[in-house]
Amino acid sequence: MRRVAWLLAAALLGLAVAWDFATATTFLGDDHLFRVFARLEANPLVAFASDKHGGEYYRPLPMLLWWLLERVSGGRAWVFALAAFVLHALCAGLVVVVGRRLGFAARTAVLAGCLFFAAPSEREAALWFAASTDLLAAAAVLGAVALFLDDRKWLRAFSVVLAAVAFLCKETTLVLPVLLAVARWFCAQNQGRPRSVRQCLRPTLPHCGVAVSYLIVRALVLRGLGGANDPLAPWWGRAVQLLAGLVHSVTAYGPLPEWVAWLAGVSLLVWAAAASRRRRALAGFALVWVMVTLVPLPVAGWVVGARYFYLPAVGLMLLLALALETTSALASVFAVALLLGFGLLSGHHRATEVRLYRQAVAAASAGVAEGLAHGHRLFFVSGGVKDLDLAIKLDKDMPEAVRGAVVIPDVPASFIWLPPEFADRLDFLLARPSLPPSGAYRFGEARLVGLARREEAPDLDEVLTRLPELRILRLGYKAGRFSVEDRTESYMRGRQ
């Protein structure tokens, strides 16, 4: 009877989390860049040998996954949502496996996996399709650690393969050899076996060799070190961002008020660290995992968003589960239910945003389609929708003529699919320094370029002076629906 109850609880947990993926997902932001790659590149393997990430990063495996999903799904979002759910569930399961290999009790390891699976921030990261980069990387890292700690040598060899997979997904996983050495150290300590730095480092040499090989290939493909041209936050700003990421990893990003998230998150982290001190070896591993996985994050410049903390959250959930180890089963169930409840609240909030976003894009698409029918090709759309040009051009219901048009949103640093005939005339609208660093994402014959950042963007009057044929569309929200209005004539009269 007890087993049936636990199986029922697990099924309810899975269904509750799956609900978010069914209702709160759509294509946003960088998702459109990956979709254009999948739509235009005939061979996805080209990302392994040439720069398809604008000189920023070398991450060919996630691009291969996106290519496959786009081709299989025909652009239907539910296929991407299903893949994201499976990846998130896989990572949660691997948290359990890693916990058991390290010596965590079965109940504690399972609890850590459930906490990770239910946590709002980790689910939020998984709900953004572009964060599949982070999910794939996390799955590969966790799998590599699990195999590395296995007693069978032939399985340990496969951890090197998974290390290569992790590196080809995201650069932050280059800390994997350190995680492997740390895992071996604490595993030996927990088992009361003698240990030395040399014994822990030697087995990681093949992984280090793969890391060096990856860096060489990356430099050759990107023709340099890569990286984004985004401005860097000051050192203290990045420190605050790291702390904020940890706090939100055990609470939620929204719709909780920030002060509530900080108060609850800091209290929870302090309590977990204090309550788990009696199991120093296991708690030490969890804390070191968090610190090691945080080390490469400040390189990003602005460390804002749940996706950055997906891998560090593994250590946080192991620490929380360890702190709950001596409590009753009811307390553990309550902890999972609390995170699940926060997640459902956050998911409902996001589902509303997704619904409004889809309505806004649909309304803008209708306005652009009407303009195209009248021979217009340049549009400015106010309404706060980033990368609107890409979203509209990826809509299969739009006329083919949209490929030769340009939709300029009022969101700085948005990306546009730039037709060759407009390249010179629209150059003044582009970011300086360029977005991406190489000047453009080049997929097939298409060029995707970033518009100016907020502080350098020209005002609308200057844009109209240079582009007098520009049509001005305005998105409005009234009576529960979005509509679009052509305000070109009224704006021109106001200028006169």
Q: How does the language model describe each region?
A:
Residues 1-495:
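Polytopic membrane enzymes that build or remodel cell-surface glycoconjugates and lipids
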